[in-house]
Amino acid sequence: MSKKYYIVSGEASGDLHGSNLMKAILKKEPDAEFRFWGGDLMKEVGGTLVKHYKDLAFMGFLEVVLNLKTILRNIKFCKEDIKKYRPDVLILVDYPGFNLRIAKFAKSLGIKVVYYISPQLWAWKEGRVETIKKYVDEMLVILPFEEDFYKKHSVKAHFVGHPLLDAISNLNPIDSQEFKKQNNLDSREIIALLPGSRKQ
């Protein structure tokens, strides 16, 4: 019987990382079924897209306050959808403000909860580790020291490598001189500006 996975990802970066995770699961479990909140990359892998992250990404205090009713409606809808689908495993990808609430609900239903890409508790809100300990069965962490951090707090954790390494490994490297030529750049140094994970 195929295993049912419900995945919640609320940002563009989570869509990328969630899609790579889905591909990895399918390599081990070709019959795995997916139902998810994510984006186009996850949809390409296959399964049922319930909500697109573009409907979920609210940034900044004011935007969150102005959209609080929508956020609460989304949390309620997500809980109802999980209850109907009854997955074998719930995988939460980053997005802690939303996902920790979903973890608590899923745990109350006896669903296995896996959290992929840890909230940066070691940098802020270390107290949240108690919430994770209570409602998350397993952490899949992307920074080597996070595994020790969680184990110190008696949380099952596995270092799985950084997903951006997967993303860049799919790119074909280009020679710097060729890049400058293609983009009409002179020989001066290039400074890269790398925006965050949310599309605006």
Where are these regions (language model features)?
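Active-site and donor-binding regions of nucleotide-sugar-utilizing enzymes
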Residues: K3-L185, L193-Q200
